[in-house]
Amino acid sequence: MTNVAVVYHSGYGHTQAIAEAVAAGAEGVGGARVSLIPVGEAEVREAELDDADAIIFGSPTYMGGVSADFAKFKDWTSRKWLARAWHDKLAAGFTVSASWGGDKQNTIYQLLTLAQQLGMVWVGLGLAPGNNHSKGSSDDLNRTGASVGVMAQANADQGNEGIGASEFRTAQALGKRVAEAALRWQSVPLAQAA
């Protein structure tokens, strides 16, 4: 059994919808148990984060970076940094912005940097870029062409119907990949690996 936590902030519901898709992808892996944790609940659900073998971080991209609520959570994790409590856990990340570009890469790098500060091991998306040739379309998996994590696009003037179906499939693929990696990561105890 492996425990995967998806911890996220969502301002308008788009990031929550992607978080739920990430969680669904992880839940589809036999032997994976998933916790979906809004950042506002992180402190009261701290044990679930500490027990997780992998933590997937998610934030909307606001003004080229993580949201203020996610930044507050990020600062809260300094206690984990000090204790090295999340050292060697797997990590991954996702973000959503209204624009196709939206400087989402900066947000993903903030999530990656957080994981590295905490001594975690980052799992990238692992998908080829979609929608980057004449026969491609916005229905392609990984339509934004990300590699470090999911960088989804959602129309600002719509609810979850403004998120393309391929974004949900891409998010599910990330959840699946992280859960599978966590199972492999656990499969050989360190004493045997040495």
Describe every region a protein language model picked out.
Residues 8, 53-55, 59, 97, ...:
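Short, flexible coil/turn micro-motifs enriched in small/turn-prone residues
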Residues 1-86, 135, 148, 157-194:
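N-terminal beta1-alpha1-beta2 submodule of the flavodoxin-like/Rossmannoid cofactor-binding fold
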Residues 94-96, 154-160:
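Short, local alpha-helical segments
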